[in-house]
Every structure is written in structure tokens, then in C-alpha cells.
Design a protein with these regions (language model features):
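Short helix/turn-capping signatures at newly exposed starts of structured segments
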Residues: 1-185
Length: 185
């Protein structure tokens, strides 16, 4: 059964407005699969939660001069289907039906309806809401068909006063250190 997703009036989906893996698990339950990847130079940790119809991508970036201290984090949702108030969009929809729905959603929530657009011979994308809504399409004959929907949360700097974020990151760093010790020491 596909995971139900609803876009928030502010940022994110299903009431998730800040970056928190614990909140994601609380809202969507434990994922079907978890992938963890470390960059070759150990400057980032990428975690992917896989659900039916939803993938969550979390990235934690480190200062290049201090590999132990995280600098900022990002998170985005890759959805197959999402509700926009009284409308919805899904992979496989024609882009000409999706754009008016997104603009209606943005207008209703008093957001800027301007967008960025990029296209090549085979694919393209629309970026709305300060790049927090990203719609990818592929060209099939004379149609542009949606083949990706990503909803981003604004990136967050890792600041000492954000105790909840720091506690969650400490858990992630602990896992990273255990893996480092297992393979590299």
C-alpha cells in the first residue's frame, strides 16, 4: 500500500516541517529499507528511508577542516503521489495539468507562484517555492510526463542551541563512528 503524502502549507509533508529522522519514523513508521552511505572523503553522511511510494533523503555535511563537527543538514522527500489541498499530482501526470495545480496551491497558501524552468532534449524540471517543490518530467512524443516529485525542507545549520537536533545527530555520529572503527581501524 502506497504511503499517503500531503504537502504542508509551509514546508514539507504530513506535518513534518523541520529536519528530524525521529519525526519521520514517528509519522510514517519504520521504513521498509534504510540505506546509509558515507562520502569517500568522509565529508557527508547520506541516509535514505524507503517506503511504498515515498523515499526520504537525509544528508549531514561536515566542516572540511573538522570531520567530527557537522556543519549543516538537508532533507527531501521523493514522492510518487501527493495531495495539494483539494488537488493531487502523481508520477505519470502530464505536466500541463500539474503546473496549474501547483500554482493554485501556492496562491492559496500565499506563496510566490514564480518558478525556475530547465529543459533539454529529453527531460526537464520546474522548481517552485524557492526550490522546495521540484517537478521533473520526461518528453514522450509531444507530451511532457511527470517522472519525479521532490519536496524539500530548508537546509538547517547545526547550531549549539538546537539541542533536539544535536541529540539526533549524536546518535547518527555514533553509528558512523562504529562503522568507521569496524572497517578502518
Amino acid at each position: 500500500m502506497m504511503t499517503e503524502t500531503f504537502i504542508n502549507e509551509t514546508y514539507g509533508i504530513n506535518g513534518i516541517t523541520r529536519i528530524s529522522l525521529k519525526k519521520i519514523i514517528k509519522v510514517f513508521s519504520f521504513p521498509n529499507e534504510i540505506n546509509i552511505k558515507f562520502s569517500n572523503k568522509k565529508k557527508s553522511i547520506d541516509i535514505k528511508f524507503i517506503y511504498d511510494g515515498l523515499e526520504v533523503y537525509y544528508m549531514l555535511y561536515f566542516f572540511s577542516e573538522n570531520i567530527e563537527k557537522p556543519e549543516y543538514q538537508t532533507l527531501y522527500f521523493d514522492v510518487k503521489y501527493i495531495h495539494l489541498n483539494d488537488d493531487s499530482i502523481k508520477i505519470g501526470d502530464e505536466i500541463k495539468t500539474v503546473i496549474p495545480k501547483i500554482k493554485k496551491y501556492l496562491k492559496r497558501n500565499k506563496k510566490n507562484i514564480n518558478f525556475e524552468y530547465d529543459e533539454d532534449k529529453y527531460t526537464g524540471r520546474y522548481l517552485f517555492d524557492n526550490k522546495n517543490i521540484d517537478i521533473f518530467f520526461e518528453k514522450c512524443r509531444n507530451k511532457k510526463i511527470v517522472d519525479g516529485i521532490m519536496i524539500s525542507l530548508p537546509y538547517e545549520d547545526i547550531l549549539p542551541e538546537n539541542k533536539d537536533i544535536l541529540n539526533e545527530i549524536e546518535d547518527i555520529i555514533e553509528i558512523k563512528n562504529k562503522i568507521d572503527n569496524f572497517f578502518w581501524k
